[in-house]
């Protein structure tokens, strides 16, 4: 075998490559197909999972935990105001007609301001932080399982709730929205986190552009 002297890079430290974030965004056209799909003959959880996915996309990329914690008191004049659990940032976004329709679909006819919007948490059953976290963890597992099955029908690999968040950010970037505004709407603590979301999109653009080099 080769001696150490014969290995010219021995004195250099070879650092591990930073593993990039897995590409999670999908095309806007794919989102629209998911939204338009007729799921009337499917089970409740499949329909619910699609609705949560669409609500996240239309709701400025709101993540599953924050969706689960939303209460009717968070709705003010067709806007949602909530505090992002992960960063503590206060976020608000306008509710589109499609998002309002999803809310109406799951609202109890006798709901109060203190009731959760979506049937994920029950205010009488899930009272401690541990009970709330466990319930959210359990439901997101079911939702993502249904989304992955649904995604396969549309030729989309690994469709999860987080794909909606990443796609929201990517669609805004493609529309020319400033990254600082996207970052603010996502509730990120700094721009570098948002950049990670958008890197795969920019890499795709570079790959496409490089087809024209020769």
Q: Where are the regions a protein language model picked out?
A:
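Short, basic (Lys/Arg/His-rich) helix/loop patches that form interaction surfaces
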Residues: 36-44, 135, 144-184
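Short, polar N-cap/turn motifs at the start of nucleic acid-interacting alpha helices
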Residues: 73-79, 156-158, 177-196
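DNA/chromatin major-groove-contacting recognition/catalytic segments
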Residues: 94-97, 101, 105-107, 199-214
């Amino acid at each position: 075998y080769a001696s150490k002297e014969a290995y010219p890079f021995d004195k250099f430290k070879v650092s591990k490559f930073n593993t990039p974030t897995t590409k999670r965004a999908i095309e806007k056209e794919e989102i629209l197909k998911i939204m338009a799909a007729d799921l009337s003959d499917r089970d409740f959880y499949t329909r619910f999972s699609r609705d949560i996915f669409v609500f996240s996309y239309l709701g400025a990329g709101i993540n599953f935990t924050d969706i689960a914690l939303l209460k009717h008191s968070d709705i003010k004049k067709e806007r949602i105001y909530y505090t992002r659990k992960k960063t503590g940032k206060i976020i608000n976004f306008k509710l589109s007609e499609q998002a309002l329709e999803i809310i109406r679909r799951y609202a109890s006819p006798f709901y109060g301001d203190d009731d959760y919007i979506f049937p994920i948490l029950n205010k009488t059953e899930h009272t401690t932080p541990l009970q709330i976290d466990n319930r959210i963890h359990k439901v997101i597992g079911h939702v993502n399982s249904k989304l992955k099955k649904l995604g396969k029908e549309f030729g989309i690999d690994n469709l999860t709730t987080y794909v909606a968040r990443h796609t929201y950010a990517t669609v805004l970037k493609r529309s020319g929205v400033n990254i600082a505004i996207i970052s603010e709407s996502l509730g990120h603590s700094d721009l570098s986190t948002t950049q990670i979301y958008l890197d795969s999109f920019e890499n795709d653009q570079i790959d496409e552009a490089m087809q024209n080099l020769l």
